[in-house]
Every structure is written in C-alpha cells, then in structure tokens.
Amino acid sequence: MRQELVMLAMLYIATAASSASAHHSHPYFYDECKSITIEGRVERVEFKDPHTWIFLRLDDGAAYTVDWAPLSRLTNDRVIGPAKNALVFGARVVVTGNRIRTLAQIREHFPDFTSDVNPNTVDPISIRRVGDSFSWALPPRANPPNCNGK
C-alpha cells in the first residue's frame, strides 16, 4: 500500500511538472532572437497572478501589451511595491523585450493551442521609466539562445 501511494505521488509530481513546463516554455511563445524596443505611456497595469500586464500606448497610436511575468512571481513588497507605484497611468516607459510568436509558430509546438495571439505582446527584458531612476531588468542569462542563422 505504501509503495502504491509513493508511486501515485511521484506520478502526480511528474505530471504537474510537465504541465507547468509546457505552460512556461518561454522560447515557444516569444522569439528570443528578435528583440524590440518600444516607448510609450502606461494606460493601465493589471497585477494578476501569475502574470502582470502593462498596457502601453505608443506615440503613433499603436497599443502594446507587456507580459511582465517575472514580477508577479516575486511576491515580496520590496519588488511589487515600488513597481505598483512606478507604473502608474501616464508614466512614460521604454521597454526592450521579445515579441510574441505568431499563432502558427506557437501551434508547431502546441497544436491544440486555441488562445488568441495579440501580435503586439512583448515579454520584457528591461523596463525603464523616462525622466527618473526607476528601472528593472532581467539578469544576464547563463545560456543565451543561439541566434546564428535566424
């Protein structure tokens, strides 16, 4: 009986880990070899677990959504508190990040993926508020993607 419970627990953990890995397979959703830099004003920010969404309006009128997932995984007040105060309506920010892949590219890896894909979604590498010292950036990657030939 005890062995059966241990086996069931191991199966559950393996299944949960693979599901979480598929959901957070960053390279399948964002093209890490094609970064863009955009500058615009914050229209709104939504702190929703497990993602934080920043909605920007660029000077040319284009609307962008920034999927700031790393922030929402850091749930201590030292990180979220300043970010909530820094990214208020009207704040001008510069975001450098990776643009989301097309629906066809995502379905190459996840054939049953059915969500809509907003082509103006960016996964940030860095965010800087214009005019003062607020900034945030991911640490350098230990194993950066190989972008040769892309």
Where are these regions (language model features)?
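Bacterial N-terminal signal peptides
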Residues: 6-16
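OB-fold/S1-family single-stranded nucleic acid-binding modules
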Residues: 100-141
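Short aromatic-glycine-enriched beta-strand elements
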Residues: 48-57
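Glycine- and charge-enriched low-complexity intrinsically disordered segments
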Residues: 138-150
